[in-house]
Amino acid sequence: MTQCSGMLTTEPPKKGTGAGIWATDMADRFPTAQVIGTDLSPVPPGMQPHNVTFEIDDCCSEWVFPNDHFDFVHVRGLFGSVADWPKLYREAYRHLRPGAYIEQVEWSVHNRSGNGTLSPNHTLAKFSQNAIRAGTMTGKTFEIAENMAGLIREAGFEDVVEKRFKWPVGPWSTDPKLKEIGRWNLLNWEEGMEGWVMAAYTRVLGVGLYFY
């Protein structure tokens, strides 16, 4: 939200809902809307508003909703999780009403430095290399951030807009907004790293937990 100046979305159900925070916030922000969040795992019960529901479902399978059903589909953070992205986008297209929107937010797995000093042997560079290799081996790409705009167009969507943002890792930036983003992004890395790499490294790449 800091990146988008407090907006939950850049356009007026959530796929891959995780803990359900985004879906809950959207339901709070738009009390007349009906928000549905789906994920493979159940969302812990809490103080969700009355207009949001969470369902256990696989977005990679055929969607169980009627055609032309949704006004908006939001997809986030599914890099490395989807084997057939074109199918997922076709399902979204089929279940959106004419004139409706799809929005997807993904993180690039390619870590970069602003001055080009990130060497191939740096831990963050090796993380990128290993993620790409694991995605190739499983058929579930980690590079969807670089390819999603083209694939969404191929699914039939029109007026596709791609926006790219710089997210620092840590509060090192002198820009107040980037400093705040970096602080949250560092927390995201610290809390998310185990979930990102544990299965990929041990089950796919066959390396130990103390690989580095």
Task: Enumerate the predicted regions with their spans.
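C-terminal transmembrane module of eukaryotic multi-pass membrane proteins
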Residues: 193-212
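Short N-terminal helix/helix-N-cap motif within the alpha/beta-hydrolase-1
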Residues: 82-84
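Class I SAM-dependent methyltransferase SAM/SAH-binding core
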Residues: 4-67, 72, 87
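A generic structural signal for alpha->beta connector loops
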Residues: 32, 51, 99, 157-159
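Short SAM/SAH-binding signature in class I
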Residues: 69-77, 103
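A short glycine-rich, Lys/Arg-flanked "PGG" loop and its adjoining helix->strand segment in the class I
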Residues: 86-101
